[in-house]
Amino acid sequence: MMRYKLVIAEKPSVAQSLAAVIGATARKDGYLEGNGWRVSWCVGHLAGLADADSYDPKYAKWRYDDLPILPEHWQMVVGKDKKKQFDILKKLMNAPDVTEVVNACDAGREGELIFRSVYELAGRQKPMKRLWISSMEDSAIREGFANLRPGVDYDGLRDAALCRAKADWLVGINATRLFSVLYHRTLNIGRVMSPTLALIVQREAEIDTFQPVPFYTVALELPGLTVSGERISDRASAEQLKEACQGAAVTIKKVECKEKSEKPPALYDLTTLQRDANRLLGFTAQQTLDYLQSLYEKKLCTYPRTDSRYLTGDMADSLPVLVNLVASAMPFRKGIAITCDPHTVINDKKVTDHHAVIPTRNLKDADLSALPAGEKAVLELVALRLMCAVAQPHIYSETVVIAACAGGEFTTKGKTVKHPGWKALEDAYRAKMKDAEPKKEGAEKALPELTEGQTLSVSAAIVKEGKSSPPQHFTEDTLLSAMETAGKENMPEDAERKGLGTPATRAGILEKLVSAGFLERKKSRKTVQLLPSHDAVSLITVLPEQLQSPLLTAEWEYRLGEIERGQLAPEEFLDGISAMLKDLVGTYQVIKGTEYLFTPPREVVGKCPRCGGEVAELQKGFFCQNDSCKFAIWKNNKWWAAKKKQPTKAVVSALLNDGRVRVTGLYSEKTGKTYDATVVLEDDGQYANFKLEFDQRKGGSR
């Protein structure tokens, strides 16, 4: 009997690429076969944790008395729409001619969980190996199959993935039900979603309460340069200094010139790539991940979901060839000499599961013009970063001038580039992008020759007024940065990063917040801001600290890493979350005075003709907000319905403010035709009535 090894990939397209390399080319029902291999696939998560009512039918209804729900024995179930593919995999795994199963799902936490869930439910009868690769290039696939690792080496990764899923289930099920029952509306709460939302709501509160502080600076125009003084808090003092300097002599106290060097940027991990793609290209984090995943499957980029910005030592020798190959494929670098110093990007200690995102050698034969625009743009960013990271430093001389006049001190800086280094590539890319992002401060600025003790005359003195700036609204770029550091904006480069979520999950978290109605993307000039909705602010107002604390959730993420490394027992992690939920259910009480928070703000459309109160639009019509007044214009008003019209916000606003409004397309029951007329509001104190007026000059056609 012929013996086979079964390979299970995460999706059909990856399975086909693997099968082509190992010679499994014969198509079967749900798998490929050949050369002693069978290759099949999952379709994302085939199985997941069971819903609450699977443990007890009473959990189908949301009741406070049933909380917290803490399963003692967890259940995994196959999705109804995934059963066919699961049955194929189960049959293949248990086939007598299959001797070994190879986990070829994505080499990361989620990929491990996707495979292990199916493997466990199928009975775990066959030995298991792990394919762990960072590139879909044929050579990388061959090397991976030649060095399959024991599946048990990744038990820690499986445990971390399963604990993450259980923690999300526990917090999501219990907190969502608790707050939904207490506040009488569905409030979706997530282990990572809620603290991420809290960051945004807190930022908006800081912006709303910000009070700008004016300041003044005195600038002196000298021959060939302008020098500026320090900030002054009151205009009178600034004007006094300006008058004292007008026409006076300035003495150059200090001229200091230093040669400085700016190191090349590190390679991309997923988060830094998503940030740059958002800032430079306007892509959302999810779009960037999707484009990069497609490039990975097309064998043009390495594994996307990485948190490393370095390469391993065994890649040093082949790196110069790759860099030159990449440079030849990028037209914007023409005329710029390409250099390669591998040591700037090699660091084995900073590579865990996967190295940084870089292009592959397949660029050499690829038709990049055939790529979708989004994928091509992301590929160019990745290529640019590789070329910059191994290029020479940017070297420049910086001159600092300090001058004195009328008892005040004034400064200016000059910059002269000695060797552009990696910035030549960046500048060429930006030129291609047609100023996609404004150039940062620090552009080249030459100063005239100056000597200490030299005196110059002031040709003009000017007072410039400014104001302190409020915090900026979050963009996906800046929010990803805040999530990565759990809100600590000044974390040292070498600090242990804990963060909200992982590079693989942050994009999905943002999309969930948008789809749930908690976040709105609002375009502002060249950026897209992330703004919290009314419900988002209300939710964070009532959530206790433990559910919105970025630091606590980041600590949980760190502990998942400890589980992955075998340094923490899964039970200890889950027991801590269960204890927190028990305490939450037992002690939380509805905050007094917050019942109104989850009532959407009502837009006022005009003044009430009866009492002068405010009339606002609600779901079924327009109503006076004065409780003692019954004025209303219903959207299903019979008078309007007979004319096949519904009173809109604009129409009602005009009726309330002007007493009349011109309406087109009114239907005549008598003629069956439409006509235009002026509708006049006549309120008799009990009902809102309407009448028509026609323009006699035009005959008022009906």
Model-derived features: positions:
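Conserved short loop/turn motifs at secondary-structure junctions
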Residues: R3-L6, A104-A107, H184-T186, C257-A266, ...
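Intrinsically disordered, low-complexity regulatory segments
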Residues: M1-A165, W169, P470
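Amphipathic alpha-helical transducer elements in NTP-driven molecular machines
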Residues: P12-A19, G36-V39, V43, G79-K90, ...
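Active-site phosphate-binding and catalytic loops of NTP-dependent enzymes
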Residues: A26-Y31, G151-G156, R177-V181, A205-F210, ...
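C-terminal or mid-to-C-terminal helical accessory/interaction module adjacent to the motor/catalytic core
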Residues: P96, D138-L222, C257-S261
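Basic, low-complexity terminal or inter-domain segments flanking catalytic cores
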Residues: M2-L6, K82, M93, T99, ...
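Metal- or metallocofactor-binding catalytic centers and their adjacent structured scaffolds
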Residues: A236-Y268, Q274
